Amino acid sequence: MRQLEHYIDVGQKRLRCGYTTGTCAAAAAHAASCKLLNGQAPDVVMIETPAGIDAVIEIEEEGCGKDWASCGVRKDGGDDPDITDGMLVVARVSYVDEPGVVIDGGEGVGRVTREGLDQPVGAAAINSVPRQMVTSEVEAIAHDCDYDGGLRVEISIPAGAELAKRTFNPRLGIEGGLSVLGTSGIVKPMSEDALIASVQLELRQRHAEGAKDILLCPGNYGWDFARDELALDLKRGVQCSNYLGAALDYACQLGFSSILFVAHIGKMVKVAAGVMNTHSRVADARLETMAAHAALCGASRELVAQVMASITTDEAIMHLKEAGLLKETMASIMEAVAKQLRHRVGEGLQIEAVTFSKEHGLLGKTAGADRLIALHATG
């Protein structure tokens, strides 16, 4: 298995990145399309990832029939401690009558059984960015081979059903296998010490550049919302991953004047409960917290039970919205967020928060958030 030679340096550590399952699926689909359309699969495939990093991936196995071809690659997780490292990801490409590229999941790829996830109920748990990557690779090969007919791509993970039992997929409403994931195409190492150190490094850099007011987001969802929906300048921003508490503590040490925290509701509702490391292995409490605040706002026992039984925060929001209690519940949650954040940072700086969901948009702000939004606005 050819390894990705892309590293990130954190302090004295040099950590190697890996590929997402989405990148593996795209590479396998690329090779299988070559095998089907011109009779020869390449030994290696180069994929340009959304992160702008070229991934050169070995093709480990291949097969073919009269109207189909398949190829597989092994996932390279880099220095990330991931149960999917080394697993085989296979793409089977076949001819279909309908034009375009149709993508589905086969053995070991989960099926969506509940609403509120990236894909609709009944679809294979292959998220949007991997689908785009697979489609792009297959269309490029079809174009090179002067083929303008339809193609079906089935992604399978032979070990996926067993590995999925060790993930949160069953609880999330994804049954029968793993999800094919990735927004950047690259897996960055998840060493906790290294991640916290990298967050601290970015905070030091912003401080050294003269920034007094800092924007914090857990990851890409918050980053994109801050830029696209709030029109914020990200130059004074730092992604803190799940380590909000560590980021706040260090920001206080550096002496920033204010912090604006922008996060998806799935992260923010944990903060309302005082959870400052939002990784799922540390704590959850999302639905319990939403249910408690709904009850404080007058929710019926039935509605509280619906919130508690939800699979995702978006599903819980839907129930609150239908009951006409979303606005009051979010105001209560954001008041709790404000108290938790101010307790963590003390009186030395102003801290405010904004939360949202991809499905419902802006959901809530703390009382002084608009002032900090104006400070970070572009233009």
Describe the role of every protein-language-model region:
Residues 114, 164, 225, 270-272, ...:
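Generic domain-boundary/flexible-linker signal
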Residues 88, 229-232, 366-372:
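Surface-exposed flexible segments
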Residues 350-379:
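Short, amphipathic C-terminal "tail helix"
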Residues 1-166, 170-172, 368:
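Generic N-terminal targeting/processing segments that precede catalytic cores or assembly contacts
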